[in-house]
């Protein structure tokens, strides 16, 4: 087994966060009274609205800015955001779906081996930081991709990046480094 051999790694996307604007003022009280699956947080000035399909939660501000979380793909996030805009239109608001952007993608990937974290950190010092007293994972940052990886000794890697492509590229880039520090099977 070598680092160059093609190993199929399953990257499971667990959360996609997106943001969009409605280009109109939203009356939060009206949304809270007439909308479905709504929680009104008056003290912080926002409304939480949940959709069942796709399963997303939206945070709505009166300025018209909406943040959607919980989607499992970029396409699902856009579909859910459009459904949310449509439901606001049905409540009587002059919603125009604009400035849609995926801002964060969270994914999990399992390596087919365990990793020696102290050795990995020593070999990749400027990018990797490991504080076992504070957190059981190595924090590895790839500035060019704006991605952060949490690498656990079990071989599980949690990747946070700006889009799905950056997450996949980050896993491809980190594989040879974690392969060097894998635990030998007895």
Swiss-Prot record:
GO cellular component: cytoplasm; male germ cell nucleus; nucleus; transcription factor TFIIA complex
Record-stated family: Belongs to the TBP family.
Organism of derivation: Mus musculus (Mouse)
Consequence of gene disruption: Significantly reduced NF1 levels.
Keyword Nucleus: yes
TM region(s), chain numbering: none
Gene Ontology molecular function: RNA polymerase II core promoter sequence-specific DNA binding; RNA polymerase II general transcription initiation factor activity
Entry annotated with the keyword Nucleus: yes
Main localization (coarse): cytoplasm
Alphabetized Gene3D superfamilies for the sequence: TATA-Binding Protein (3.30.310.10)
Tissue-by-tissue expression: Ubiquitously expressed.
CDD domains named in the record: TLF
Subcellular location: Cytoplasm; Nucleus
The protein, known as: TATA box-binding protein-like 1
InterPro entries given in the database record: TBP (IPR000814), TBP-like (IPR015445), TBP_dom_sf (IPR012295)
Function, in words: Part of a specialized transcription system that mediates the transcription of most ribosomal proteins through the 5'-TCT-3' motif which is a core promoter element at these genes. Seems to also mediate the transcription of NF1. Does not bind the TATA box.
Keyword annotations from UniProtKB, A to Z: Cytoplasm, DNA-binding, Nucleus, Transcription, Transcription regulation
Protein's gene: Tbpl1
One Gene Ontology term from the biological process aspect of the record: spermatid nucleus differentiation
Subunit composition and interactions: Binds TFIIA and TFIIB.
